Design a protein with these regions (language model features):
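Short acidic loop-to-beta-strand element that houses the catalytic metal-binding Asp/Glu
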Residues: 109-118
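Intrinsically disordered, low-complexity Ser/Thr/Pro/Gly-rich regulatory segments
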Residues: 71, 78-89, 215-227
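Catalytic cores of nucleic-acid endonucleases
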Residues: 106-108, 122-193
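Structural alpha-beta junctions
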Residues: 75-81, 152-157, 171, 195-204
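Conserved acidic residues
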Residues: 113, 127, 199
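A short acidic/basic microdomain associated with nuclease active sites
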Residues: 74-106
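Interdomain/boundary linker segments immediately adjacent to catalytic/signaling cores
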Residues: 1-81
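Charged, structured surface patches that assemble and position nucleic-acid processing machinery
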Residues: 170-227
Length: 227
């Protein structure tokens, strides 16, 4: 509730679409209210590890804020009606099939927090999976390594044959990354190089960059690539 209340302030000031670019200040600005809520839960015995709960709230809030703004844009007609979003893509059977890569007898699946997908004639048409990270210190590398594995699985390179790598789905998902970049790691050259593996990357801050898009550009990317 404190996080959503703060987001609504930015929606009021900048509009629904541009509020995507203020998810970082939304999370930072609601920090004190979240701390008060955590103190209350610790006092009531609902949680024991305040630090772990804080990390969990930040991660889940980032996902829920994206989903909230996206659905509000769809409600207003800015997102086509046959495009959907899920914050539980691992439980979606059609998406699960689309993201499964076989390496010998084993399977490899990406780290994905959100999936945005289109449906045409009651069938899954295109899909864009997003890995969300509040910080690049987290598991961003896991996602781009899976994307690289997908490229190998769908190419004619000798590595594919050597390790018996295969991908059985006709349509490949698009793979993206979104961050609020709490610690400004995107300026690290090592992290910058990682972004080239993604079909698109987004940041929830009102900044301009030549290698990562503003999160407010997500709806246009979806319209251009999923229909």
């Amino acid at each position: 509730q404190p996080v959503l209340a703060k987001l609504k302030e930015y929606i009021e000031e900048h509009g629904l679409l541009k509020s995507f670019d203020y998810l970082h200040p939304t999370l930072v600005g609601s920090k004190d209210a979240v701390e008060d809520l955590l103190d209350f839960r610790v006092k009531n015995g609902e949680i024991r590890d305040k630090g772990q709960a804080r990390k969990s709230i930040a991660g889940s809030a980032f996902s829920l804020l994206i989903k909230y703004v996206f659905l509000k844009l769809k409600e207003s007609g800015d997102i086509p009606r046959n495009i959907f979003i899920t914050s539980n893509p691992k439980k979606h059977p059609l998406i699960e099939k689309m993201v499964t890569i076989y390496v010998g007898d084993d399977t490899q699946k990406p780290d994905m927090d959100i999936a945005i997908y289109s449906v045409i004639e009651e069938k899954l048409h295109r899909c864009f999976i997003l890995s969300l990270k509040t910080s690049l210190r987290e598991r961003a590398g896991q996602t781009y390594k899976w994307k690289l594995l997908l490229e190998i699985a769908t190419s004619d390179c000798s590595v594919r044959e050597k390790y018996n790598i295969r991908y059985d789905n006709e349509t490949m998902p698009l793979v993206g990354f979104a961050t609020v970049n709490f610690y400004d790691e995107i300026n690290n050259p090592q992290h910058r190089g990682m972004f080239q593996f993604f079909d698109s990357s987004f940041i929830g801050k009102p900044i301009k960059s030549d290698f990562i898009s503003n999160l407010s550009e997500l709806p246009e990317f979806v319209r251009a690539n999923l229909l």
